[in-house]
Amino acid sequence: MAEQSAGGQGAPEGRDSRDSREGRGRRDGGRGGRDSDKSNYLERVVAINRVSKVVKGGRRFSFTALVIVGDGNGMVGVGYGKAKEVPAAIAKGVEEARKGFFRVPLIGGTITHPVQGEAAAGVVLLRPASPGTGVLAGGAARAVLECAGVHDILAKSLGSDNAINVVHATVAALKMLQRPEEVAARRGLPIEDVAPAGMLKARRESEALAAAAVREAQTSGAQP
């Protein structure tokens, strides 16, 4: 009788332990889903600095991180995080960058027209380039352009070499870009008169490739 009662008490404990393990599995699965969502973005840490604050008891040290986040397909953002530890500063920078996402108009892997951006003492000049040129830019500007999905571009820093100024000047330049349709509508001209034929051809080709990729994804998803 004693063995039966002990066995009866053991069964609920086994179920509880299984339920708790299953609950942990579901929670872990949820975290995995969020991690996989974040992994779809490109992240670049441009600069990490240690700063100190003098207080009555001495000095307090903290770290700042300048982070670029983008989807590699026209979306990019810049974040600046500050914390007592480097990983926490980077995490804060990533969250701020994702909140500040903006769309960059691209045609065939390059920008739509030359543009110059300024921020504080930073000045960055961006020029479109032909396919195969690559990203010809310095480290800080390159991080922004690569995360934005730009594959061919000429970039030159005309002002301060400070990474923070260069990054913000590059972002300012990208935000000034306009699509050919916007320029044509503002001038009251057909789009062929404001955009080179090569650019329009590259846009048609990129749109055709994107449409083909969507159809292929839909076809593969419909197959059993």
UniProtKB/Swiss-Prot annotation:
Keyword Transport: no
GO molecular function: rRNA binding; structural constituent of ribosome
Biological processes per GO annotation: translation
Segments of this protein annotated with the region Disordered: 1-38
Pfam family, one: Ribosomal_S5_C
Domain of life: Bacteria
Key words of the record: Ribonucleoprotein, Ribosomal protein, RNA-binding, rRNA-binding
Biased composition (Basic and acidic residues): 13-38
Stored InterPro entries: Ribosomal_Su5_D2-typ_SF, Ribosomal_uS5, Ribosomal_uS5_bac-type, Ribosomal_uS5_C, Ribosomal_uS5_N, Ribosomal_uS5_N_CS, Ribsml_uS5_D2-typ_fold_subgr
Purpose of the protein: With S4 and S12 plays an important role in translational accuracy. Located at the back of the 30S subunit body where it stabilizes the conformation of the head with respect to the body.
NCBIfam families, per the entry: rpsE_bact
Quaternary structure and interacting proteins, as annotated: Part of the 30S ribosomal subunit. Contacts proteins S4 and S8.
Family as reported in the entry's similarity comment: Belongs to the universal ribosomal protein uS5 family.
Record protein name field: Small ribosomal subunit protein uS5
Species this chain originates from: Mycobacterium ulcerans (strain Agy99)
